[in-house]
From Swiss-Prot:
Family membership: Belongs to the RecR family.
Domain Toprim, residue spans: 80-175
ZnF C4-type: positions: 57-72
InterPro entries associated with the record: DNA_Rcmb_RecR, Rcmb_RecR, Rcmb_RecR_Znf, TOPRIM_dom, TOPRIM_RecR
GO MF annotation list: DNA binding; zinc ion binding
Protein's name in the database: Recombination protein RecR
Role, per record: May play a role in DNA repair. It seems to be involved in an RecBC-independent recombinational process of DNA repair. It may act with RecF and RecO.
Domain of life the protein comes from: Bacteria
Organism: Burkholderia cenocepacia (strain HI2424)
Amino acid sequence: MKQPSALSALVEALRVLPGVGPKSAQRMAVHLMQHDREGAERLGRSLLFATEHLQHCEKCNTFTEAQICEVCSDEERDPTLLCVVETPADQIMLEQTMTYRGLYFVLMGRLSPLDGIGPKEIHFDRLVRRASDGVVKEVVLATNFTNEGEATAHYLGQTLKARGLAVTRLARGVPVGGELEYVDAGTIARAMLDRRTM
């Protein structure tokens, strides 16, 4: 039996999410249509609202509804510290630890030459300009401890150190192969407090 085109379109749309294959997408689509149409409508409205209103912060590249995000606008933050993370989810996890009071730069990815992701795709030039503004004294590399995250940290560290900046890396409280988004706040807090010079 061929499924209705509207259901097929919904299944395909759900497959854009990371880790969602055809069977999971099918289950989600059927669940929404059969058991939670109100939830489906809310999801649709929220996605539309987010795509229309979210943009990248002009300073740190995270998602925001304004030109400059709340963190970059906070005059209580230490502008001499710049923490580099891969994703907004990583930034949120670090903020939840309440151990870091500097500013951020969000790469929106990590180096992965096999996937065609190089320095341009992770906004490397913007990061270098931000870190070299004469205010930043220390750059904290908080990329994930995956192979790509380590390669990204190494590349960024070498380049930023060559510009005379102090570069530190989160300590190894975060498990090797771990991603910040999935690590508990206590572990991230310890890693931030025990960061080391590269």
